[in-house]
Amino acid sequence: MLVNVISMVLSFLENVISVYGEPISDWGTMAEKVLVTGGFGLVGSQTVRRLVDDGHRVVVTDLDTPAQRKAATSLPANAEAHWADLTDKREVDVLVAEVSPTVIVHLAAVILPAAYRHPQLARRVNVDATAALLRAAEASEHPPRFVLASSNAVYGSRNPHRHPDRLRVDSPLQPADLYGAHKVVVENLLRASSLEWVILRLGGVISVEPGAMPFTGDALFFESALPTDGRIHTVDVRDVAAAFAAATTADVAGETLLIAGDDSHLLRQKEVGLALAEARGLSDVLPAGRPGDPDSDENWFVTDWLDTARAQQALKFQHHSWPDMLAEMRAIVGWKRYPMSFVGPVVRQLLKRQAAYRDAPGRYADPWGAIRSRLGEPRPDSSD
């Protein structure tokens, strides 16, 4: 929530002060040809950069929009764009046939909270498009390794009072929302395929860049609905990119791995918001929020702490601690932290108006009820 608000404010302060991909060409001899879906998103853009830095040839695919075309002009050397709508099976078949990748890193998805407001689109992208991509990959003359982005949402609601241990790969899968259910479906599709596969279940991905995440009323409302004492295991997006890049070649075929930061990233929901606000020069701007009900297994969100030992051993991706991220955020904001104090009251009122429990009765958070009231039904439907 704070990342979005701060992004808007910093952009304002800055103002006060101050290709289409052709058919894949001859790239020469390099390690792998990696197709990255959703390659212009938060995780995708960092993953593309890391793959190129590691010496791979990268083909980035995403929807053909003006914003994506503009982003494509900044792709690094040894990366190029190939536009495709993954919900169109014919375009998927053409994409995979023309690129002929040795590895597919599948990041394209409708994530939260947009998936709640657009459930049919979310299923087409998260499930149907993934299934089409898997079929096209299996039909390739040289089937690629398939690295799938999944989520800790597959485990469902997590009451830390009743579940004190960290989540493990073999913890029961009990998705509580449609996004988690979608990820369970595509994980199973991938395991049932004939492809060499790797699944990475991600924790709470955060960027140090103020403008990295979109600013929307839905996002503010959504984040304010989460229990303030809910556990969340954050991770720097650059470390997520490092994990995906490593997974393209590491000896982890057939493994599911949990991707989150080192132990400094074992946080509570409220801690994250307060720390991000302070790093950007904003204090006392968060609405009070509500804790989760310790006697309920349902009224909690789908985040928790993860056992990342095996993933770190295999992929060696944890490079940015939580304190280091906060220090970097302060450095990026620099002198602008000081005038931020003057806009604090405006930000406070903005967040208060978007708060999920404003004027609502009750003591404890009800994330699913709040989400349902504004964004739509979050629970899995029968097709999930």
Name each region found by the language model.
Residues V34-D54:
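N-terminal Rossmann NAD(P)H-binding glycine-rich loop of SDR-like oxidoreductase domains
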Residues H56-Q68:
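Conserved glycine-rich Rossmann-like NAD(P)H-binding loop of the short-chain dehydrogenase/reductase
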Residues W83-V125, G156:
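NAD(P)H-binding glycine-rich loop region in Rossmannoid oxidoreductase-like domains
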Residues T87, R117, L121-A132, L173, ...:
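Glycine-rich NAD(P)-binding loop of the Rossmann-fold in SDR/ketoreductase-type enzymes
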Residues A131-L178:
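Conserved Rossmann-fold NAD(P)-dependent oxidoreductase catalytic core, especially the SDR/UDP-sugar
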Residues P160, Q174-V198:
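Active-site Tyr-X1-5-Lys
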Residues N188-T234, R238-D239, G273-A277:
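NAD(P)-dependent short-chain dehydrogenase/reductase
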Residues A243-A314, H320, D324-E328, K336-P345, ...:
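Mid/C-terminal beta-alpha module of Rossmann-like enzyme folds, strongest
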